[in-house]
Amino acid sequence: MERTWRWFGKKDKITLDMLRQIGVEGIVTALHDVPNGEVWTQEQIRDLREYIEGYGMRWSVVESLPVSEAIKYAGADRDRLIDNYKTSLRNLALEGVKNVCYNFMPVLDWARTDLLHPNANGTSNLYFSHAQFAYFDICILKRPGAETSWPDDVLAEVEKLKATMTPEDDHNLVDTIIVKTQGFVSGNIKEGDEHPVELFRDLLSLYDGITADALRENMRYFLAAIMPVCDEMDIRMCVHPDDPPFQILGLPRIVTCDADIDWFLHAVDNPHNCLTFCAGSLSAGGHNDVVALARKYASRTSFVHLRSCHIFPNGDFTEAGHLGGRANLVELVRIFEKTDPTLPMRVDHGMTMLGDEARGYNAGYSFLGRMFALGQVQGIIATVDNELGLPYRQPGLF
């Protein structure tokens, strides 16, 4: 598998010089300074591609070319935004960048309630608490009817939190759920925005009355519109599963499980309509057999995220070490190496380790934690390649 790394552009505190020393072959990035919905010009793309290539690596995957909210909820501006999207795709392909990761999650790109949850060994990681998320939903966001979305045991925990949460705790929870995890990814709400809760409510209101079936139809419309460009330019569009893979905040989630993946692959049945196989997102749902999904969909996968989650008895989940958790990364690497040993892979997220926390890295995207994980995955790949009789590459040494 091609060893890639998510890099947030020239402003990233992790430099390309650092990455080429740790075995990274390809870069996963985007034009993060271009607002959602605007065209990525060929000149902008070329500038970034050449910058990456100047460090001996290639721009392997776009993550992400964001799908504007108005495309997802079928707003009046949808067709104009899709035309812009097609122009950006064409410009990417003209510069040789032809693997594009995206998602179709409304409003929230991914959700956690704690970005620095302590581990016994002194590291920290990402954590999702149903009770804390429900507290945000009911007591901070005050979403109408929110109480009906949560089971009685979670509501009982919310009552306990009401007695202990301070205004500072509330602020930190808001910052975690709708600012720190979103600003550097979707740009919907950013650091420094005033009244983020009110802005978030406004975004949620755009999806009033949008059912899962309606969102599916909007996804079908989008894919049908862009596939002719993908066919012409040989672009693989690989959708990212919903994170977490269950409904939150009353929003429909339509890429959460086997049936959902099967649906979108057949909704527009085209070899350029592909999957980003995110083992972490899928393993956060107890309903998913991650290895079985990999076996079933490896041939329609054009990008792999390797991480793993552990689910607690109450349904909360945390990022596990890359050798632990539910995902079984050893078997996943074996499946994907057999299918296509050139498939781009990145270690997704990583523990925050001693030396990471003070550096101001984006949530979940530490340097030392991901470097440690990449070393583990390199070992898995070397072992699997030896089993399969494949030559093992040592990137950057010879």
Task: Map each language-model feature to its residues.
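Catalytic domains of carbohydrate-active enzymes, especially glycoside hydrolases
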Residues: 9-32, 51-55, 91-100
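A short glycine/small-residue-enriched secondary-structure motif
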Residues: 21-22, 57-72
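Histidine-acidic metal/acid-base catalytic patches
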Residues: 1-4, 9, 17-20, 70-74, ...
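Conserved beta-strand edge residues that scaffold enzyme active sites
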Residues: 33, 66, 106-107, 244, ...
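Aromatic- and acidic-residue-enriched segments that line the glycan-binding/catalytic groove
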Residues: 109-197, 256
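Glycine-rich, positively charged N-terminal anion/phosphate-binding segment
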Residues: 12, 39-60
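Glycine-rich, proline-tolerant flexible connector loops at the mouths of alpha/beta enzymes
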Residues: 30-46, 249
